């Protein structure tokens, strides 16, 4: 089982192989997540977000993602579409260009590749 630090190292190594720099942020506080999203404007090329339970009800995170208008990938380690009915609804999805669910930790690497391709194609 991977720790959060292990996951960050894994993602950083895989992104490095692609020549991509990544930074990380984790919080259980909705406002802190929103602040981090807002701080990405003009500084980051894209956002990969696993919003956890906020996925299902945080219209504030949706609004923040829409406001910064960066290429965004929604990632879930488990397949949220195969879980309880309430987990199948993502209120943040309209602000995301891609949703990757059920691929475990590899989903983060898939998201990096997807966003890199979109950024390359659309500038």
Roles of regions detected by a PLM:
Residues 52-55, 78-80:
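Short glycine-rich anion-binding loops that position phosphate/pyrophosphate groups of nucleotides
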Residues 18, 44, 68-71:
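Helix C-cap/helix->beta junction micro-motif
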Residues 21-24, 73, 82-123:
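Short, glycine-/small-residue-rich phosphate/pyrophosphate-handling segment
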Residues 25-38:
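Structural motif
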Residues 39, 58-67:
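Short Gly/Thr/Asp-enriched flexible loops that form oxyanion-binding sites at enzyme active sites
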Residues 1-18:
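Glycine-rich phosphate/diphosphate-binding loop of Rossmann-like nucleotide-binding domains
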Residues 40-47:
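Short acidic/histidine-rich motifs immediately flanking catalytic phosphotransfer sites
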